[in-house]
From Swiss-Prot:
Catalytic reaction list: adenosine(1618) in 23S rRNA + S-adenosyl-L-methionine = N(6)-methyladenosine(1618) in 23S rRNA + S-adenosyl-L-homocysteine + H(+)
UniProt main location, coarse: cytoplasm
A GO molecular function held by the record: 23S rRNA (adenine(1618)-N(6))-methyltransferase activity
Function: Specifically methylates the adenine in position 1618 of 23S rRNA.
Protein name per Swiss-Prot or TrEMBL: Ribosomal RNA large subunit methyltransferase F
Record carries keyword tRNA-binding: no
Family: Belongs to the methyltransferase superfamily. METTL16/RlmF family.
InterPro entries with a match to the protein in the record: METTL16/RlmF, rRNA_lsu_MeTfrase_F, SAM-dependent_MTases_sf
Amino acid sequence: MAERNELHKRNRHNGQYDFSRLTEEYPPLKKFIVLNAYGTTSIDFFNPRAVKALNKALLISYYGIRYWDIPKNYLCPPIPGRADYIHYIADLIQPDISDESTGLKTAVPNTRQYRCLDIGVGANCIYPIIGQTEYGWTFVGSDIDPVSIDNARKIVTCNPALAHKIELRLQRDSRKIFEGIIAPNEYFDVTLCNPPFHSSKEEAEDGTLRKLSSLKGKKVTKAQLNFGGNANELWCEGGEFRFLLTMIEESRNYRKNCGWFTSLVSKEKNLGKLTAKLKSTDIAEHRIIEMHQGTKTSRILAWRF
C-alpha cells in the first residue's frame, strides 16, 4: 500500500514513501514502521494512529507544516489523493502550467492571486494547506461543524506560512452550501468539495466494513472497525447525489461569484443524472476529470456559467 501509481505528474507522492526521510523529519513515525507482505517498509494503514503519524510526517517533510492535528474520530485524509485533486484543479484554472512542472511554486506560472473556496473544509484543513503551499492560492474554508472550524483555524494560526492565507467560515444552515458563505461582491476562481457520500450512518459503516473486509481478505466486524470520520464528514440525508443536486441548484445564484464549481464524485452511477442536471441548468461548460490512484479511479465534476 506504500505504492501509489498514476498520480498526477506534479504530485510529490508518486512512487513509494521515503520512510527514511519521513522518520528523520518526524521521529514519532518510527514506532509505526512495519514490513508488509512484500517485505518492504510500510505502516499498518488500518491503524489510525499510524496514518495520523504518516500525515504529520508528510506535511512536515513536503509542505513545511510544523503543526497539524485533528480531534479524535475525525477524518484523517490520505494526503496523496487529496493532493491530486489540487493539482488537477490547478490544470483547470491555470492551463498554462507545464506537465514538466515539479509542483514547486517557483515552477508554476502565477501572475495573479487565485482564490478558492473549500466546501466542507473539515478539521484537517488539508485542501487549503496543499493549495496554498504548492500554488500560493488563498482559501476560504467552510464547514457546518464548529469543532472542525476551530481545529482548522488552530492549524492555520500555528503555521505562520498559512496565516492570512486561509480564512475559516462556519455554515450556520446545514441545508445550504454557498448561501451564507459567499458574500454578494465576493469572487472565487474555483470551489472545491469532497461531499459526504453516504445517506446514513448505517450505510457509511456497512460501506467501510465491505471495503476493509475486501482489503484484508477476511471479514471485519463492527467491533474491529475504527470508524474515522464524524457524521458530517461521511453522510448526509440523500447522500452524495442529493448533496450535489443542491450544489448545482445553488450554483446558479452564484454564477458571477465563481469561475469554476467543482466536486469529487465517488459514485460513478451518479454522474449521468448529475450531468443531465447540469445541461438543464444553462451552464456554459462542464467537464469530468478522472484521477487514477493505483486500482482506484475517482472523478472531479466541474462546471461553469
